[in-house]
């Protein structure tokens, strides 16, 4: 592995601060949705939910770091009776999600810092490509927060830090003509992501046992846990 990928990077992604206006930010989010389609990003989350809930069940799901809401719309298509909440602390993300989601989908989008969400529980808490945005300390706290607020279980889908995806994603992004910030931030996000050993250490720091870790194509590490209240 290249030396620059031996340890997790602390370089910050540009998108949250470098977009000139909402229109550019929304374009980046639309391209990220395209990335998720091309790389089948949401498949592990959807498969996990199918294993734990009937398609017609009226369970609740909270998506942390929901972005444009494409994961929640995918969940809605498969689980028409689910009660869906999307949380993101960036106001432009919430605005873009509301604009991209038809009213008939009935998704509750909330602009908030997740740690400020007190007094609310959900059957399932999910996040997709969110964990690598956090520091190690924040991620430990996030794991503990999920354990406190998920009734039936939680699922983290994130990137796997690997040289092939690190060097390959910019080529894919250029070929697909995705926004420059998406192309550049993609490599940064991969460098900020985790390897199996690091996830084990973070779970231990959080005091969480019984979590399952699985690798998914292409270069995704997913962490799932069924909660004691289920």
Where are these regions (language model features)?
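A short, conserved alpha-helix within the catalytic core of class I
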Residues: 134-145
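Class I SAM-dependent methyltransferase Rossmann-like catalytic core
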Residues: 22-44, 52
